[in-house]
Amino acid sequence: MIAYLISGLRRTLCLSLLMLGSVRSMAQETIDFSPDAPGATTGVDIMKQGKIDWETGIGLKWDRRNGEHARTFTINTSMFRLGLTPQAEVRLQIDECITHTPEGNFGGIANATIGTKIKVYEDGKVFPKVAFMGTMLIPGGSNAHYLPKHLGFQAHLLFENELSSKFTLGYDLGAEWNGDTESPDLFIGANLTYQPSERWSFFVESYNRYNSKRQDDWDKPGQDSHFNFMSEAGLAYKVSPRLYVNTFYDISFNEFSRYSNIGLGVAWLLN
């Protein structure tokens, strides 16, 4: 387990150094793009046709909700976005994690998805910009610790209003089903972004899930709930037109003192 952790850290560090080392050569670039990371909600912007974005990072999550006592380290999360047409992009994501519990340690692929984001409406002045995002969750085998046992799906409608030159309001409505539960979760999220300058941006968001069946892992021990209330805050800094760095921190309002998640990330326009 330690060797697996060290290997993941070494890989993430090498990739980060590679990206940071290329900043000087990219300083004169005028190309710009809009990363999706960070944040649990997703923006409406689509990658330009033929362009590839790589969004990667690490994270550490403490989870003691519902009597659990787990620490999960994301040693690498990678999202690749390819502009397929002027109206659509293809999205591939894979995450690797290690979890420590009092009963023992385990690790492996924590998330594997393929999906698309499609531009629906882009004027965004009187009416909000709109995009559709569809995702397929790839299942794991019988020995998988994180992946669902069955094929899962997510479908989201994404909206964005420009409130002013510095403030943007985004909201995200969707349904998510991992293939293992009786009914899908309804996802409702809202994101307020403040961009005081060309390089800096800050955001705060609320993202929540509702399930028609009460979930025992969404509440205190011995209790269950229809709702899972979460919140996240973070910032991003544009190092160059092709490279962004970001960080985030999120909490659970169901058991405020028993959950926290912090992460660092990089978004890089590869071509």
Name every feature range the model reports, one short phrase each.
Residues 23-27:
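Sec/Tat signal peptide C-region and signal peptidase I cleavage site
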Residues 9, 22, 115-117:
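Generic N-terminal leader/processing signal
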Residues 28-271:
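Transmembrane beta-barrel domains of Gram-negative outer membranes and organellar outer membranes
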